[in-house]
Amino acid sequence: MVSTPFQPLATLDHLVVAATTLADGIDYIAEITGVAPQPGGKHVAMGTHNALVRLAEQVFLEIIAIDPAGVKPARARWFDLDNIALQAELTERPRLIHWVARTTDIERAVAHCPIPLGNVYSMARGHFRWRITIPDDGAPPGKGVVPTLIQWDVPLHPADTLPKSNMSIAGLAAAHPDPGVIRAALAALGLEGVLPTTYDRDARLAAMLHTPRGIVTL
C-alpha cells in the first residue's frame, strides 16, 4: 500500500503588526527596516485599515489600525483591537500581535484544530474576497500564538500586488505558559515547524526579519 504524503492544512500567510494609527505603524516599520509599506485599504465590516509589505511569494506583513473614519462594528474587532490594555501598549510603539495562516479548506482546518479558533466570516477589501476565523471576543487564539485561519476566495493574493521589498522572514518564535497545548494545535494544522514554541509565564510572538538594515526583530 502506497502512503499518501501528509498535506498540511495551513501555511503561513501573513504577520500582523498593530498600531495606534496607521500612519504610526507605517512610519515605525519604515524606520526600523528601511522598507516603506504600501497602501492597503479599508475593512469596512471591522472599522480598520491597513498597509502591507511583501515578505515572500504569497506572504506579507500587515500593519493594521482602527480606522478613525470607519464605523465601529456592533461586534468586537478582530485581532483584539478594541482591547484597552492592548491600545495602551500600542501608544508606546507598534507591536507584532498575531499571525495568520492560509488554508484551502477553512471549515476542515477549524474542525481539526484542538484550540477554538472562532467562527468563520466572509470579508472583502477592494477586489479581494476571503473567509477568516474570528473569535466572538476578538481575542486571537492561544493569546496570539495560535494563528487565525484565512481562505482566499479569489485567485489574486495580496502579496502578488506588492513590489519586492528586500525584506523576508529569517525566523519565527513564540512562548506560552502551556507550550504543549500550542504545539498540539500547530501540529494539527501542519504548522509545527513554522513556529517553535517554548515555555514562559507570558505569551509572546516574535518575528526575525532580514531587512536592508540587518536583522530586525518584531
Label each residue range with its predicted role:
Residues 2-12, 17-36, 54-218:
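Glyoxalase I/VOC metalloenzyme domain signal
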Residues 36-43:
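Conserved catalytic-core motifs of GNAT/GCN5-like acyltransferases
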Residues 43-46, 199-201:
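A short beta-turn/loop motif at secondary-structure boundaries
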